[in-house]
UniProtKB/Swiss-Prot annotation:
Enzyme Commission (EC) number: 6.1.1.23
One Gene Ontology CC term in the entry: cytoplasm
Record's subcellular location: Cytoplasm
Assembly description: Homodimer.
Residues the UniProt record annotates as site (Important for tRNA non-discrimination): 30, 81
List of residues binding ATP: 219-221, 228, 484, 536-539
Record organism: Coxiella burnetii (strain Dugway 5J108-111)
GO MF term list: aspartate-tRNA ligase activity; aspartate-tRNA(Asn) ligase activity; ATP binding; nucleic acid binding
GO biological process: aspartyl-tRNA aminoacylation
Protein name as it appears in the record: Aspartate--tRNA(Asp/Asn) ligase
Family: Belongs to the class-II aminoacyl-tRNA synthetase family. Type 1 subfamily.
Reactions it catalyzes: tRNA(Asx) + L-aspartate + ATP = L-aspartyl-tRNA(Asx) + AMP + diphosphate
CDD domains associated with the record: AspRS_core, EcAspRS_like_N
Amino acid sequence: MRTHYADKVDSSLIDQTITLCGWVHRRRDHGGLIFIDLRDREGLVQVVCNPTESTVFKVAESLRNEYVIKVTGKVHKRPEGTVNPHIPSGEVEIAASDITLLNKSKPLPFNIDEYQEVSEEVRLKFRYLDLRRPEVAQRLKMRSYIIREIRRFLDERGFLDIETPMLTKSTPEGARDYLVPSRTHPGQFFALPQSPQIFKEILMVAGFDRYYQIVRCFRDEDLRADRQPEFTQLDLEMSFVEEKDIQQLMETMIRHLFSTFLNVPLPDPFPRITYDEAIKTYGTDRPDLRNPLTLVDVTDLMKSVEFKVFKEPANNPHGRIAVLRLPKGAELSRKAIDDYTQFVGIYGAKGLAYIKVENIDNGTGGLHSPILKFLPENVIAEILKRTQAQSGDILFFGADKAKIVNESLGALRDRLCADLNLYEGQWKPVWVVDFPMFDREDVGDWQALHHPFTALQETDPEKVIANPGDVLSRAYDIVLNGSEIGGGSIRINDIGMQYAVLKVLGISKEMAEAQFGHLLMALQFGSPPLGGIAFGLDRLVAIMTGASSIRDVIAFPKTQTAQCPLTNAPAQVETLQLETLGLKVSKHRK
C-alpha cells in the first residue's frame, strides 16, 4: 500500500509522487489549508491539503487524531521559514492528491503527547496507544537493532544459536519457579526456566563448544524496583576457555555495541576490581565508578573508644565502621541531614552520625558534631587524615553489622551523587572478580553467592568442605554505571568438586541426583573446561537508550506487582480446566 516510510521522505524525492500509510498525529486548519502530521513507525511527515482538491479536502476535514489513513501526493519543498530541523522530513511536505480513510479511532483514553499526566497502569492497559509514542517506538527499534548486531557479532565468531527447553524440571536456583502442571502426567509439573544454565553446560559436554541464545527466563520472585517476572538474556557458553577468554570477548562486544549505536568509545581493557575491594570502597559489588565518593574503613580506630555506638560494632567480628566523605558538604542543612538519616534507615541503619569540617586548620575546634565529645582527639585526627578531609567537608559514619553499613552507606553514596550531580564521565564499565564462593548470614546455612555450578579457585574438595568461608570462586560480573549488566563464571567440570560444593550447601548426593542428576551424569562423560556469561538484555538496552526503567524497553511489560493490565493476567481459569489437570485451588497461604 505504501511506497515509503516517513524517515525516507526528504529533499531527494522532490517532485516525485509517493504513498504513505499511518496515523493522524495532529491535524491543523490554517488559512484555508489543512495540515496533517502523518505518523508511522519511522517518524512524521507533514501533509498539505488544498481546497482546490475538493475530494481530498473533504476527507481531511473529517479526520481526527489517530485515524488511520493512506496518503498519495507529490513531494514539495517547504516554504521558507517553515522548515522543521528536528525531523528527517522537515525540509519537505506532501501535497495530497488522494487520501483514503482506512479506519477510524474512538476518542482516546489519554492524549498520547501528554503521557506524563497518565498513570503507568493506564498506559500499560492501553499499551498499544503508549507504544505509538515516538520515543517508545525508538527504544523498541533500538532493541531490535542491538539484538541483530549481537547475533551478527557472535555468528561471525563461530557461535551457534541453539534453543533450549522452555518446559523443564524445577531445580533450586534461588528464586521460586513458575510451575506448569502436566495433564498427561497427573500430579507432576514442569517448570519454566530461570536460566538455561544446566542445558548449556550439557551442550558443552556434547561438543558444541560455542553456544549462544537470546532467551526468555522466568523467576517467581518478590519484585523489587525495576524487575520483571519474565525477562530476556543473552546467554552464552564456551569450552576450553579461562576467565580472560570470555572477558576479552565480551569487552569487545560491548565496546562494539557502544561504538556502533552511541558513537561512544569505552576503555580497552575494562578495569577490574575484586569483590572485597568493591564492598570495602563502595559498599556494593555493583559500583558506579562515575561517582567519586568512597567509603573509608575506621573500624580499627574504634575498638578502644568509650562511645558504645562505635565500640560495640568495632569489636564484633561481623561489624564495621566506615566513613563517607562528602566534599563541600558542611553546608548541608539540618533538614537535609535528617532526610539522609531517614534514608539510610531503609537499609537497617539506626542513625547517621556526622562531623562537619568547618576549618581543618583549627583542629577539633574547627569541627562541628554531636559525637565529638565521645571521641579522643588522636582518633579524630586519624579519621581526618584517612579520609583526606578538607575545610567545608562533611563526614558521614556507618556503624553496625558490616552488611548494614555497606548497604546503607553504599546507598547514601549513590543518593548523594545523584542529588548533587557529582558524576565524573558518562560511561564507566568495570569487571568485579574474586567473589566468595559461599555466603551466609552470621551463623546461618551456607549459600552459593552465584550458583552451585560455579568453579572455585581452590582445587582440593576437602579444603572446600573444611573452610567454605575462605574459598573464592571463578565468577565475574560486568557492571556499567552501577548496574550489573552481565554475570558469569568458569564452571565446575569435575564430579568430585561438584559433590563437595553441594555438600557445603547441605544438598545430599541423593537430593542432588533427584534435582539435577542429568547434569551430574553428564559431567562423568568427558566434560571439557567450560565457562560462560549471561547479559540482562533488557537492562543493557535500557542503559543504552537512556530509559528510566526496563519496562520502557519491553513491548508488553508486567507491573511491579507482576500483573499485565492489558490482558488482566494472571486470571482465574474455568473449573473444568483445573479438574482436567487434577488441580484444586485452596486458600492462599503467604
